[in-house]
Amino acid sequence: MSILPLPALPVLLTEQSQRALSRLREAAPDEPITDSDSAVLALSDFVSDALALHPDWWQGIHQQPPQPEEWQHYADWLSNALVDVNDENALMAALRRFRRHMLARIAWSQALQTSTTEHSLRQLSELAEVIIVAARSWLYQVCCHEWGTPCNAKGVAQPLLILGMGKLGGGELNFSSDIDLIFVYPENGHTQGGRRELDNAQFFTRLGQRLIKVLDQPTVDGFVYRVDMRLRPFGDSGPLVLSFAAMEDYYQEQGRDWERYAMVKARLMGGMDDAYSQELRSTLKPFVFRRYIDFSVIQSLRNMKGMIAREVRRRDLRNNIKLGAGGIREIEFITQVFQLIRGGREPGLQGRSLLPTLQHVGALGLLTPQQVLDLSTSYLFLRRLENLLQAIADEQTQTLPSDELNQQRLAWGMGFDSWDTLQSMLSQHMQAVRHVFDELIGDDAPDNNDIPEHSSYSSLWQDTLDDGDLAPLTPHLTETVREKLMRTIVEFRNDVAKRTIGPRGRDVLDQLMPCLLAEVCARQEADTVLSRLTPLLLGIVTRTTYLELLLESRAALAQLIRLCAASPMVASQLARYPLLLDELLDASTLYQPTAPGAYADELRQYLMRVPEDDEEQQLEAVRQFKQSQQLRIAAGDIGGVLPVMKVSDHLTYLAEAIIAAVVQQAWGLMVERYGQPSHLQHREGRGFAVIAYGKLGGWELGYSSDLDLVFLLDCPSDVMTDGERSIDGRQFYLRLAQRVMHLFSTRTSSGILYEVDARLRPSGAAGMLVSTVEAFDDYQRNEAWTWEHQALVRARMVYGESGVQQTFESIRRSILCAERDADTLRTEVREMREKMRQHLANKDKSRFDIKTDAGGITDIEFITQYLVLRYAAQEPRLTHWSDNVRILELMAQYGVMEESEANALKLAYVTMRNELHHLALQELSGRVSKDRFVAEREQVLVSWNKWLMGA
């Protein structure tokens, strides 16, 4: 149809038209000018710019005016335009020119109403599809030439199928729109006939990347379409292209409600009707349209309605004809409600285009005739207005203009004599849509968010808020903290959007987050606490049972927040191993660590749940036990139940129990394979011992400490094992030690047990992993350096039978009690300390390294080790303990050191260790301000000078 003769242009539009026409006259001075030219050029800067650059397009419009059905020629026209294209750059230029040319014709026809709004939407959609298909075909041939043709196992060539989503899929694309695509191929396989072979996934990924570049990358000619691939399975974090099988698995196992909404409009680009296309449609259909009337979707729709309402209020979207109340999105939403609920039973509701589907909704009596009429009329009104708005400058916007020129353009283009008249009619249409929307969806169902104190936090979680929206909820926070908090919420919400969460998980998360935010935002350090919680939450968003645990148990949620607020180390542990959340259910056990002597029995009972012959489950169970016990120790630490020395005691008892369990497991595996060494037939025990050095030996274990271990065996040289695969007895113990190391270091889903360092064994890394008791004794007497005797001060046996323990303790005592030249000993200990200090030098003089700097913990350790080696020959009882605190007590008790000095060193040691311990809980380094521990450092240096400098 035509509205010619056209009404007179307002003055402002006449002036705009004359400016545009003057440019065209320069480019095509002989071309006649009509009233239609003046009208279109007044409405669209995009059209006037395009025709000024390509005056032949203007001439073409005069010679062959745009027609409603000319989309049927797009494929042929584009094919002709690509005849001389020989490379990707030329392809990109040709596609951009073609899109711009066709858009100019569509805008011309649209402005003059020589085609209906439905025709314009069809033309815009067909244009995009033709370009996408042509680009795919051109690039497919090029890629096949480079890498061969992708084939399945039977050698059948595999195509790239492209799903157009959203308005493109529905044939309702707007004038300036991005395009939502999903790439998929039928079967896995490899390329054939190319210079190099690729698997199909690689081939189609590369093809997809090149296709996106051809369409999306800005050049001097602009771009063709902004390509959005986020609707694909797993979003941005997923593969760019999936096989049919992978896509089917995803939608069956993890498809979410919003993906059902999106898939309603999915359409294969190119109108393909081959076997592969039919297979893909059949695969997707059960996910989108359920065979039964699917009322389970209603709550999701209500939740979405509430989100829309909050977004309208928050963003003041009254001037947005798509997102505002009663806008285009609500009409689309209303239509899809019926498609998702009843589409499985009603084939007429399975269409992709909105208006035909809306008519079928009316025919089924699901909406009244008046409602269908109101929605259809409003939809066409809004879509025409949207296209005219975007055609002004080829910009993707749905917000009505505030400047007079563009307001007059829209008013005249819509057939109104003024902006106010247009706005009045627009308001009527949007109110009619909103009325149907409210009637259809109803009120949000009551849920957790209806609790008064949580409703605001529901809005905070569900919406993309401005920073200012957070202030009323958190008046006690500073602006800086609010900004950090807001940033964390937004980043978390974006990260969640990339995860594949089922409908139930999404619902639970949406109920949990307001509760969690209400608790967290009440804290002064809300930003810090939330930043510690979000990694954990991201780790469990796809594991609904954990979300439900926190939602249903407010006590567990409270304990989680408390622990994460107190310690980022605990937060990190929970994030890595969510199984630990079960420990939060009972506060009475959470804050009461296992009794020191009960760890071995607790672990034994824990392992009884696991088949003894299942090595993998045994490994996993020991790790889970360690983590749960460490969490309880940390909770007791944070809760003030355990002082720092007791924390180390508990961590040490735990490690000893685990060492025994690991040796037991390794022993069982070795005996099953080789039998046991024959010399054990008439004696108790296993002839194997584990010696702990360092922090474990000294009862000073921390949360992340590694274990310094040395393995000893007690086995005659002529012993063999008694199994069918008999091996040398000492070879058996070597393999046993190797198996122990393997069990400690194997990484399972629950991580490793401990880092184990066995380099303190005789001859270090060059020595045998396990030594005989006799070889250990000989090495310590004849080859060991003074620093190795220092290390022996902190050594003790943590696994083995009493006979081996007595032998080891006898060797240790004998070595430590040996007569030594005082000056030589002092020099060697002092020089070793200097080497360490140089190796671990702290170059930042404004900081004090609590452990390694002068006056720190290492100096105290060297003092105690020196004193044992210096005076144990006179007083053997100085060798009784392996930890620094009790060694200092022995020094005072037996008169080696004044009691006041021993107490001062002990206090300095405990104070600095306590600080190191709490820094570890905060995941901070051991370097503090140089102004810290001044008195303690002075005392340590006085003692250092006294004992090791001879001052």
From Swiss-Prot:
UniProt KW Phosphoprotein keyword: no
A cellular-component GO term for this protein: cytosol
Cofactor(s) this protein cannot do without: Mg(2+)
Ranges where the record places region Adenylyl removase: 1-445
Keywords for this protein: ATP-binding, Magnesium, Multifunctional enzyme, Nucleotide-binding, Nucleotidyltransferase, Transferase
Molecular functions per Gene Ontology: [glutamate-ammonia-ligase] adenylyltransferase activity; [glutamine synthetase]-adenylyl-L-tyrosine phosphorylase activity; ATP binding; magnesium ion binding
Region of interest (Adenylyl transferase), residue spans: 454-951
EC number(s) reported in the record: 2.7.7.89, 2.7.7.42
Keyword Ribonucleoprotein carried by entry: no
A single GO BP: regulation of glutamine family amino acid metabolic process
Reaction(s) this enzyme catalyzes, per UniProt: [glutamine synthetase]-O(4)-(5'-adenylyl)-L-tyrosine + phosphate = [glutamine synthetase]-L-tyrosine + ADP; [glutamine synthetase]-L-tyrosine + ATP = [glutamine synthetase]-O(4)-(5'-adenylyl)-L-tyrosine + diphosphate
InterPro entries on file: GlnE, GlnE_rpt_dom, NT_sf, PII_UdlTrfase/GS_AdlTrfase
Top-level taxon: Bacteria
Role summary: Involved in the regulation of glutamine synthetase GlnA, a key enzyme in the process to assimilate ammonia. When cellular nitrogen levels are high, the C-terminal adenylyl transferase (AT) inactivates GlnA by covalent transfer of an adenylyl group from ATP to specific tyrosine residue of GlnA, thus reducing its activity. Conversely, when nitrogen levels are low, the N-terminal adenylyl removase (AR) activates GlnA by removing the adenylyl group by phosphorolysis, increasing its activity.
Similarity comment: Belongs to the GlnE family.
Name this protein carries in UniProt: Bifunctional glutamine synthetase adenylyltransferase/adenylyl-removing enzyme
Species for this entry: Pectobacterium atrosepticum (strain SCRI 1043 / ATCC BAA-672)
Gene from which the chain derives: glnE
